[in-house]
Amino acid sequence: MSKNGIITKEQFMAELRRWQQGSVSRRHFLGVTGLGAATAVLGAAMPGLRPRRAWAQGDIGNRVVLATWPNYHDPENFELFTDATGAFVQVNVFGSNEEMLAKLQAGGSGWDVFVPTNYTITTYVSEELIEPLDVSKLSNYDAAAFDPRFADAGTVDGVLYAVPKNWGTTGFAVNTAHDGGTALTSWKDFFDRTMDDFSGRTMVHDYQLTTIGNALKYFGYSFNSVDPAELADAERLLIEVKPHLFAISSDYQPAMRSGDAWLTMCWTGDGKQLNTDMPEIAFVLGREGGEIWSDYYAIPKGAPHSDAAYALIDFLLAPKVNAREVLAHGYPVADSRTNALLPPEILEDPILYPAQELLDALEFGAAATLTDPNRAELLARFKSA
């Protein structure tokens, strides 16, 4: 609030987004903003109360709901989309593919667009939770522009269900000011040092694929293993490490930035964002290997605002818009048209584009891991220990 008690448009929008993302209660939102004070800016801020702009595809409604990962978009692009279409982008953030799958299986998610990872798409298809895409509604989609390694998973049995968003790797971020002059280079270092000089300062994902997968790599096993004996080894390690953790969370940037955490499992773009703002934080791919992944835009079955969903995906696929996304979040993109617009320092950045020998050791997630009961039960035991 300002000194005279009147909330500004920027403050109102910030509180509105916190409420829509579930970060605060409706009571908090109403109390902080004050309906009387907010009235002056409601016409510019609330969907349905602002005049709709003309849009080439016609009237798409006043809202579109996007389910996505933390720190994964340029908010200014959403504002530009709203200016162009009149549809407000409501963002729901999730921390794992299991969380996303469970939400869609339960029904009534209210989502229009979601961002699944490559290995999950066949499950969505088999459970009839995802819509085939009508490419005639995606004028900015050009299949030939995408690297097949990061695009092929979107097509199942010859039908296109998802289009590429970004790709990246899973490593760890370490605040080198606290490494005592001895660099961490492996998953063995990650877990061993967590139980030593990084005790109480380490975070792992709230996500079975990566937390279990990286524990498996400690022993030299496959990142995707569902072998009971190998999972038992990973569980013993995780239970041993648990008392030394700062937190189990997929939203680790705040703790790393504040200095509460010094070491965390980390995705490419987060590593780039942290390193850009705090050069003492390094992003490391464990030399044993780990995960390479690709994310996609998709539309869930029964999306309530289907026209707006297509409009948002098409808008975000436009090369100039996509380039702004990359510059904001730091995740590589598989679209050659977008890459042609990016500066060399992005395309040559070793965090975003690691050396080939490091990439060769990485594995794409396997569909079996998403629904394997042993992995799900292992993570539950680890979290409750």
Region roles according to the model:
Residues 109-113, 131-135, 140-172, 200-202:
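A structural signal for short loop-to-beta-strand junctions that line the ligand-binding cleft
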Residues 295, 300-359:
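Mature extracytoplasmic/periplasmic domains
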Residues 131-142, 162, 279-291, 300-303:
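Short beta-strand->loop
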Residues 122, 203-207, 211, 215, ...:
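Ligand-binding pocket segment of bilobal, Venus flytrap-like solute-binding proteins
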Residues 1-28, 51-53:
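N-terminal secretory signal peptides
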Residues 119-130, 151, 155-185, 210-219, ...:
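Periplasmic solute-binding protein
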Residues 55-123:
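Early extracytoplasmic/lumenal segment of secretory-pathway proteins
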Residues 24-45:
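N-terminal export leaders
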